[in-house]
Amino acid sequence: VRILGGVKSPVLEEVKKGDKLTVLEDVSDWKKVCTKSGIVGYIQKSKLKDAKKETISREFEEPDYTGIKKDYKINLVWHQVTSEAANEGIEDALAATKGLNTISPTWFSVTDNSGNISSIASTDYVDYAHQCGLEVWALVDNFDQNVDDMELLSHTSSRENLENQLVNAALQNGIDGINVDFEQIPTDVGDHYIQFIRELSVLCRVNNLVLSVDNYVPKGYNTHYHREEQGVMADYVIIMGYDEHFAGSYEAGSVASYNYVKEGIEETLRDVPADKVINAVPFYTRLWNETPKTDEERAEDQGTEAESYSMKVTSEALGMEEAAQRVSEAGATVTWDDTANVSYTHLRANE
């Protein structure tokens, strides 16, 4: 069964003689079919035999998906770990915090289209976190630019390899859960992505691992992440309630204004049960630099989204302590914005 009609189209699933397929539509010499496992794709007409019509029963009962639900509020922090040596910073990191019960180190990354991963997981890290009363939900990302999300997620074999590697690494290191942080998923990959979440949820459930999935603030352009289905399959759905304005923004603004955060929570609650929703807040802000565009820059922006903005904007991310220090050093006055519910300040270049 292939992604599209044609012998050169990638294979989605191998089927064998005797397998039952549901025909959805005819496309020239190919038929659009659905396999028993729910994969939709195309197969040559000549490969199909004994076609017959069946009346499908509508008496369907939604299965009861069991999962893991903690009897306490999740207070989670992501811990950016970029090397095995950086795992040793867990003691200092936790010493500066209080109230946490979950930590999510950035340990796993998908490295190729076959579903292999890199890992900097540490059992010593896990043991120390457990001693401090914290669960460890290891994060996996898809940030490697050499990985094609369609190639990775549209094939059963690569999904299974990725799922098995994640669960095996979790079990080997005593990890309590997996946090999926797949970003910038193309629209046409959405169905394959949610299939990955479905399959991973089964493995996690069998092995008593918590599954959490990171999501953008809901917008029309990211509905293909299938939040409602995530709300069924995952134990927790995490809103990345920040990046309202980000490094590539055309105008300066808040990282997470009140209404933006409120919208993210309310829209997510339309699809996901409240006891599964976690909202992530930023512990950083941005220092913005605005300069009037030159004639050359305005010409370059013609016909693009940037055309309607008169200022050229750059920024750098600052942790909250560094941001406060910069404000103090500049002798700037901090103002409270009643609409955004954030503090801000601004300086002219000659001040």
Predicted regions, residues:
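Active-site groove signature of glycoside hydrolases
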Residues: 163-192, 241-243
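Hydrophobic faces of well-ordered beta-strands that scaffold small-molecule active sites
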Residues: 75-77, 103-105, 136-138, 178, ...
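Substrate-binding surface in catalytic domains of secreted glycosidases
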Residues: 113, 164, 190-323
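SH3/SH3-like beta-barrel superfamily modules
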Residues: 14-46
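Glycan-recognition patch characteristic of GH18 chitinases/ENGases
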Residues: 55-160, 165
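SH3/SH3-like (including bacterial SH3b) beta-barrel domains
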Residues: 3-17
